[in-house]
Amino acid sequence: MAMITSRRAAAPCKAQATRRSRVMSVVRAAAVSSEVPDMNKRNIMNLILLGGASLPVGSLALGYGAFFVPPSSGGGSGGQAAKDALGNDIKANAWLATHQKGDRSLSQGLKGDPTYLIVTADGTIEKYGLNAVCTHLGCVVPWVAAENKFKCPCHGSQYNAEGKVVRGPAPLSLALAHCDVQEDGLVTFSTWSETDFRTGLEPWWA
């Protein structure tokens, strides 16, 4: 009888011990689970952070793009006064006094397009101007004096000193415009509709 009573008393103790063991296992598992990062939550946070970070970058890119896209492209009809960065008419003497031989600087040309005025080797204004709009996707192409060429910052197209395309993806040379100095010294642009002297072909912009 004593043995039976002892066994009966021990049974509840074992059951309690088993329950405690299970409870402890659940607690440990919960603790470990809380320490392991939830991949779904991490992915969501990464997307949020990426989206937030992309906003200022996107705005910057848009601002940059807008700077290089001109208001229009191609030539116009009739003569038009060339204008400087402030919108003032350009006079030949004043321009030559501040621009050296070989200089290529932007002015406002036909239809308001950015157009290069060229100073020749003998110190006069060249008889033609170059529309600065890239023939690929319309970026304004800077003149790189150190390399004696125009290089597009958008997709790498290049043009020689006369605006002839020498490297793509631009398919065509820069558009030409006649450039003349009037009797009063005013510099004017007019449409170039003759053969393109650089290629021997009809002007694609006319």
Curated annotation (Swiss-Prot):
Disulfide pairs here are: C139-C154
A Pfam family per the record: TM_PetC
Q: How does the UniProt record describe the way this protein sits in the membrane?
A: Single-pass membrane protein
**How is the cofactor bound here?**
Binds 1 [2Fe-2S] cluster per subunit.
Task: State the source organism's domain of life.
Answer: Eukaryota
Q: Which GO terms describe its cellular component?
A: chloroplast thylakoid membrane
Asked if the Swiss-Prot or TrEMBL record annotates the protein with the keyword Hydrolase, the reply is: no
Q: Name one GO molecular function term.
A: 2 iron, 2 sulfur cluster binding
Q: Which reaction does it catalyse?
A: 2 oxidized [plastocyanin] + a plastoquinol + 2 H(+)(in) = 2 reduced [plastocyanin] + a plastoquinone + 4 H(+)(out)
Q: What class of enzyme is it?
A: translocase
Q: Which CDD domains match?
A: Rieske_cytochrome_b6f (cd03471)
Q: What job does the chain carry out? A: Component of the cytochrome b6-f complex, which mediates electron transfer between photosystem II (PSII) and photosystem I (PSI), cyclic electron flow around PSI, and state transitions.
Give the protein's recorded name: Cytochrome b6-f complex iron-sulfur subunit, chloroplastic
What organism does the record attribute this protein to? Volvox carteri
